[in-house]
Amino acid sequence: MLGLLTITSVFRNWRNSLQRKEDYDECHMRGINNENEISGKSEKNFKLDEPPISLETVMAEFKLSNETLRRMMAHMSRNMDKGLEGGPENSTISMLPSFVPELPNGTEEGRFIAMDLGGTNLRVMLMDIKPGEELKTEQFNTRIPNWAMRGTGEQLFDYITKCLAEFLIEKGIENDGLPVGFTFSYPCDQKSLRSATLLRWTKGFETTGVVGEDVVELLEQSIARRGDIKVEVVALINDTVGTMVAAAHESGGECHIGVIIATGTNASYMEDTSKIKYGLSKAIAAYNYPEMIIDTEWGGFGDRSEADYILTQYDKIVDSRSEHPGVNTFDKLVGGKCMGEVVRVVLEKLTRARVLFNGKGSDALFQQDSFPTKYISEILRDESGSYVHTRDILGELGIDHYSFSDMLLLREVCVVVSRRSANLGAAAIACVLNRVRKQNMVVGIDGSTYKYHPFFDFWVHDKLKELVDPGLKFKLLQTADGSGKGAALITAIVARLKKRNLKQQQQQQQQQQQHVTMVEQNVVEQIAETKGSREQFMNGNQKINLVTNDIPIYDSFNGDIENGVIHLSTDH
């Protein structure tokens, strides 16, 4: 296909250069200086001063060598180290603590509530977990209304609590005091498993009075205002952490990285506690576990221009027109939120250069955000020679003047842009795998872009094999509903750890009691033996010292106690 496209592109470049020369000559013949009047064509169709562009030049910009990808991996790894040391002030990869100390081990059981606020949707779920069985789930879905997304924090959390209460009341469990796990998929500075301060809103939220506040406290205050439900919020997690935990549950307890590739991208992995300087410096309670899941927040990589060498001119155009220019750079490169718009900008450039559609675009094609990312998946699903979806999409864009080679070129643009995203995502995953460095590593992946793009998973796996260090083995596990299942499973892990810690405390108390009893018996025996042999002592002021730790004072012997030492007198 690429050979045909190359031939087609060369022919078009030659033909279009002749056409541009004819138009230019016509312009001078008529004495017209206004480009918009050339041959009756509007400015949106082409400009004489456009730099040369072809499919080859586009592909050259989006093609990243493994050398470039490894350079990016090295920069990411250094930023991860800086994030562990100093957090978001020190690095564009924040490396935020989750305070989740373990993965599920298969013994979790109980009934739990999970809430998932991600994007513009809210889900409330009731999950029954039993060892060795599939999770049983009942759920309620709703869309967050625009007034809540752009209103006050009190309005937003009151709406969330309203949905929770209605679900619990419908199930008749509003007074059962069930534990709640809350998946809150926005960057938070976490201070414990149930305390997290929102750093910034993403995904279209502009709710006031939440940034800088403790999200769990806001939810609990809203629950208290209602007063008609009884629950306990025990964990607040990120969707990436939930994906990692859900993947571990599916794979029998093993998952080394959790990855989201949806509208944006993020990852989590298990890190040694000794390396988590920033996260533990703000902890509100002692953390007594050897490991912790880290929420990398790698979507911000590049926000300080440290990754400019992987940006194309099209990425820069899309970023400059975005809602938050210069923010979440890696999100925009890998996730689906901007992928369609990048393709559209490329198509617009090719059209204006008369490489595509004979230079005749449409108002829709030249309108920002008119080419959603789902178009890419639909175009690439077309079977060879059919192009049913491609024709439908061109119709939706108001383009009816296209050739077979136009459809081939459109498809190839979708390939080069989305494959670049897959390669960057693979490089980021490989960076973490090379840091974790364990055998037979499991990567749990969730997200709409990864799931619904027909080739994305294959491209990620293919590139990973080239970038992961030799000798390291890995497996990709596509995980369904990590944000929902993960929240319930983490709540179950908390319950399991609570039981385990209580049991350990009881065992320690029993061991201490047994030790005390043994010491007491030894002292009593020594006292009895000493009293029975007092006549053997010739010197009335001789004393026997028995070291007694943690034993009560006895009144049944003759002697003194000083600094924990019993002095038994031999006086008659």
Curated annotation (Swiss-Prot):
It is an enzyme of class 2 (transferase). Activated by glucose-6-phosphate. Inhibited by N-acetylglucosamine, glucosamine, mannoheptulose and ADP. Belongs to the hexokinase family. The lineage of its organism: Eukaryota, Metazoa, Ecdysozoa, Nematoda, Chromadorea. Its EC number is 2.7.1.1. It catalyses: a D-hexose + ATP = a D-hexose 6-phosphate + ADP + H(+); D-mannose + ATP = D-mannose 6-phosphate + ADP + H(+); D-fructose + ATP = D-fructose 6-phosphate + ADP + H(+); D-glucose + ATP = D-glucose 6-phosphate + ADP + H(+). This is Hexokinase. GO terms for molecular function: ATP binding; D-glucose binding; fructokinase activity; glucokinase activity; mannokinase activity. Residues 238-481 are annotated as: Hexokinase large subdomain. Pfam families: Hexokinase_1 (PF00349), Hexokinase_2 (PF03727). It comes from Brugia malayi (Filarial nematode worm). Optimum pH is 8.4. Residues 105-237 are annotated as: Hexokinase small subdomain. One of its GO terms (biological process) is hexose metabolic process. Pathway: Carbohydrate metabolism; hexose metabolism; Carbohydrate degradation; glycolysis; D-glyceraldehyde 3-phosphate and glycerone phosphate from D-glucose: step 1/4. It comes from the Eukaryota.
